[in-house]
Amino acid sequence: MASFAQAAKSLLLKEFVGAFFLSMRQFFAPKATLNYPHEKGPVSPRFRGEHALRRYPNGEERCIACKLCEAICPAQAITIEAGPRRNDGTRRTVRYDIDMVKCIYCGFCQEACPVDAIVEGPNFEFATETREELYYDKDKLLANGDRWEREIARNIAMDAPYR
C-alpha cells in the first residue's frame, strides 16, 4: 500500500506542482526590496551610526571633558585632552579624537556622557577610500553634530521615555 501511494505521488508530480505554485505565488507578490541609492529604508531612533559632538543652542560645545566616554570605551577608540579650567570653573576639550577603525559602535560612550555631548547619529553612509579618513578629530565631530543636529535631537526626544 505504501508503494502504491509513493507511485501515485511520483506519477502525479505532487512535489513539483506544489513547488511550482509556491514559486508563482512569490513571483507575483509585491517586491520587498528598495532601490537603495535613491530610496532609503526607515532607521530606528536608536540607530548607532556615525559619531557626532553636539553643541548647546548658544553655540558652545557640550563636552565638559569629564573623560567618561574615554574610560568606558571597550575598544579604546576615544582619546581626549582637556584644556585648563576656565574662569567659570568649567573645562572644555583641546583634543577629542575617535578612531572609527577601532570603534565597535556599542553606544557606551553615548550612554556614559552626562551632558549628551557625544552621540551616534543617524548617518550610515560614511564609507571612505583611506583609513586616515576614519580618524575623526574634534572639528570633524562638531561638523557632524551641526549637520545632523535636527535628527539627533528628534531621536533623543523620541527615546527619552525609555532612558
Swiss-Prot record:
Keywords: 4Fe-4S, Cell inner membrane, Cell membrane, Iron, Iron-sulfur, Membrane, Metal-binding, NAD, Quinone, Repeat, Translocase, Ubiquinone. Its cofactor is [4Fe-4S] cluster. It is a peripheral membrane protein. [4Fe-4S] cluster 2 binds at residues 73, 103, 106, 109. It is found in: Cell inner membrane. GO terms for molecular function: 4 iron, 4 sulfur cluster binding; iron ion binding; NADH:ubiquinone reductase (non-electrogenic) activity; quinone binding. One of its GO terms (cellular component) is plasma membrane. Its EC number is 7.1.1.-. Transmembrane segments: none annotated. SUPFAM superfamilies: 4Fe-4S ferredoxins. Binds 2 [4Fe-4S] clusters per subunit. InterPro entries: 4Fe4S_Fe-S-bd, 4Fe4S_Fe_S_CS, NADH_quinone_OxRdtase_chainI. Residues 53-83, 94-123 form the 4Fe-4S ferredoxin-type domain. It catalyses: a quinone + NADH + 5 H(+)(in) = a quinol + NAD(+) + 4 H(+)(out). [4Fe-4S] cluster 1 binds at residues 63, 66, 69, 113. Its main location: membrane. One of its GO terms (biological process) is aerobic respiration. Belongs to the complex I 23 kDa subunit family. NDH-1 is composed of 14 different subunits. Subunits NuoA, H, J, K, L, M, N constitute the membrane sector of the complex. NDH-1 shuttles electrons from NADH, via FMN and iron-sulfur (Fe-S) centers, to quinones in the respiratory chain. The immediate electron acceptor for the enzyme in this species is believed to be ubiquinone. Couples the redox reaction to proton translocation (for every two electrons transferred, four hydrogen ions are translocated across the cytoplasmic membrane), and thus conserves the redox energy in a proton gradient. This is NADH-quinone oxidoreductase subunit I. The gene is nuoI.
